[in-house]
Amino acid sequence: MQNKGIVICTAVLLTLASIFYLSFSFATAYYDRQAAKIKDPIAQQDYKDSVKYLGIYSYQKCLETQIGLGLDLKGGMNVILEVSVPDVLETLADHKTDAAFTKSMAEARAEEEKSQSDFISLFVKYYHQNAPGHRLAELFATQQLQGKVNPQSSDSEVERVLRAEVQTAIDNAFTVVRTRIDKFGVVQPNIQKLEGQTGRIMVEMPGIKEPERMRKLLQGSANLEFWETYNAEEAIPYLQQLDTRLAAGESADTTAQTKAEKPQQAAAKKPAKLQLGKATDKGSAAQDKALLEQAHKEHPLLSRLQTTGANALALVGYASVRDTAAINKCIYGTEAKQVLPADMKLLWSATPEDGVTAKNIYGLYAIKVNTPNGQAPLEGDVVTDAKDGFNHVSGQPEVSMTMNSDGARRWAALTKANVGRAIAIVLDGVVYSAPRVNGEIDGGSSAITGNFTVETTKDLANTLKSGRMPAPARIVQEEVVGPTLGAASIQQGIESFAIAFVLLIVYMVLMYNFIPGMIANLALVVNVFFTLGILTSFQAALTMSGIAGMVLSLGTAVDANVLIYERIKEELRLGKGMKQAVAEGYGNAFSAIFDSNLTSLITGVILYIFGTGPIQGFATTWIIGIVCSFFTSVFLTRLVYEHQLNKGRWEHLKYWTPFSKNLMQDKHYKFMTMSKSTFGVTIILALVFIGSFFVRGLAQSIDFTGGRNYVVQFEKPTEPEQVREVLNHIFPGCTSNALSLGTDNKTIRISTNYKIESNSPTIDDQAETLLYNGLKKAGMVSQKSVEAFKNPDVRAGGSIISSSKVGPSVAKDVTYGAIISVLIALIAIFLYILVRFRNVAFSVGSTVALAFDALFVIGLFSLLQGVLPFSLEVDQTFIGAVLTVIGYSINDKVVVFDRIRENLKLHPKRDIQAQFNDSINQTLARTINTSFSTLIVLLVILFLGGKSIQPFAFAMTSGVVFGTLSSIFIASPIAYLVMGRKIQYLDGSVEIADAKA
């Protein structure tokens, strides 16, 4: 074998690297066992802090470097954040109240929901339609974009700047998210920008047990501002005038036909004060309601907002949380713009106010926007440090801040100019505190106080230290997996992997005798070792789908060994010596192995690019496994054989057993003659499946429709039909469903699209609370609180053990990506076969057969949904399975076509039909062996891999069966028909390119 030294050197380096990286996992496990022997928790932590692995690496470094476990194995949280591009544009634009700008933004938002065009392109298109003759520079030649956009800039230049600014905002958001996660203390998080999906950031956080807290941390924009304020006695008269204006019913375009009242005049017309949270009268409920409606009519604003007194500083009023929406319409509407001073801005408090008897009463503050650019005189970018602690006077939790020199100077000037007044500390548009300034504050120190908990101050300090988010980021997809479910997945993964591995070992020995079988099995062991080592070095997390990818790569490795051994057996039957037979067996099998592995790699790369989460985990391990299996099966095993043969050993080695010696040998099936019948059966099956699409359709998961999934573990067996009835009452008007995930009817997946279009961060908690209340009312759960119901560790009484959310924009992109990824896979394989075989007949035959393979798998999911004991929903994992079927199925077709190509080259004058028949018969043993060995693996995953992986395993199992049959009965006959016509045009001459490596 040539390049033997390179092979040995590569093997040694891979072995050393794998040992090094995998050793961190063993070191961490050892230190954990030693620490567990120490009873005192503080002493435990001291021990972990003191250890040094190899004298260099700390325990924390070992944790970060060991092989990571994904969410489905360890439990945790996976989210996809989307940075709002429209919000970035609104921040950059000057004329935000311009009608054309507002209309263009609204139309672009609506179009984005159903278009694959990016938001900037859509906005530019609609702005040109709504403002003909106007240029984008009129909107974006602002102080913020000074030096980048000027009044003379062309639209193309402005568009280029906008795209750069959006990308900068996304990059900054990525940095902020990473900083927040690191400061939160998550071990081995996976944070990455999703390529091809503008503004989306994926965050995987294994081990997270507080999803609500993490949602707030990730979505907070950290836009910290310090504002000057109006005093209450200055602001309240304007609110009274606005109340009068609203009561009179004056519209937005009413001209000033009557002279506006002065604030002092309006002050005389005060409504009767209402006691917050109490009835307005002691009469009946009907009278109370009538009086309240009359009060709202006479005083639309001040019947809901209780104003304060003269000593309230910037606090102008109180209101119940239920009235804030109505008040917002009043204070942010058109009338408010005409009545309130241009520099007045009203903001709510972040938390309910202290000193108010009723609950959920929030304060309204009057902010003074008196800067030329409309920005706060001091912002959070001057904060250099933030610490959580306790106020030394009140003992309440607070956040103290330290500013840089510029911030300290401006803070001193701001406080000096506002002695005796309040300065509002505003974070993300809500007021956290508005303390009175008693004197100039120098040194750049300040504190934020409020109704905080210790956890709130920690998260707030973390958020401030990490910096402000350049634009609001919202969670558009989410998955939460409980740690107990993860432990079960680990057990299932280990069992399925171990059993599949043992069965493959037994199968190889049974088919190819002990020594050849064990050498192939040794290659499998080395393959797994290298795969795990490379995964660890990349710091990639091992997931359940990743284990499935690794198991499937074992099938690919077996395929390579089967090809080599079948070739060696052929050479031995021709009477060649062992040394020559081994050399020619490896040489003749190389091109088929190379082509089949490369086509699988093409599919794996497409899976990785278009997939997210579990699909990427599967693709990663599959790609690494394919590369490792090629190296171990083709090169390392050959080194072993050549070493032994050069020493005069194994000269009489047998590559068969009595059982397999004559298996599928010397067969003369006339497959091409059967093609008419097989085409007929194929068309009938295709029509059945297509008919099923129209009649039954496909059960689409939330990946394609958008919505929320909750996997609920009930205490007692519960029928899905009963849960569905309850869901109709819990989420009226929504599409909801319930599906049993186990045989005991205790684990049920609940799906709903309840308010999935809303971007409010409170909707998730709202949906979970509604679900808890509804199930508890129906007697299906007995948890005492919604917090216990949401805790996956508390199983008694019923609880949510995992959850996921997919927003409508993600669902749209998943649908588009699924179609594109399958089409790209087919086109890529068509082109590769065309380049390698240089004959369009093979490309046409393989592509048509692969399309039928995909159709049959999808058709089975339609035909058998509701029949099998597990879900056959179409989700991202299913699309991954279809692509994997395409990648695997092409292997068999490449092997058959490789033999046809070889025979046509050896016997160019022989009958073309005989050539095809003989080639298929010659590779029949390999086809059966490979398919059977792969089916062994897939059946183990199907029955032992757990509910989450069963649909994938079923799709793959059916795909392997269809793929094997289509290689013989679809791909080859079509290639035969196309090639037969081509040969007729060539007057009997055959042109076949030699594509051997």
Where are the regions that the model predicts?
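Interfacial segments of transmembrane alpha-helices in multi-pass membrane proteins
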Residues: 2-4, 399-400, 404-419, 423-424, ...
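Small-residue-enriched core segments of transmembrane alpha-helices in multipass membrane transport
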Residues: 12-15, 430, 517-539, 550-557, ...
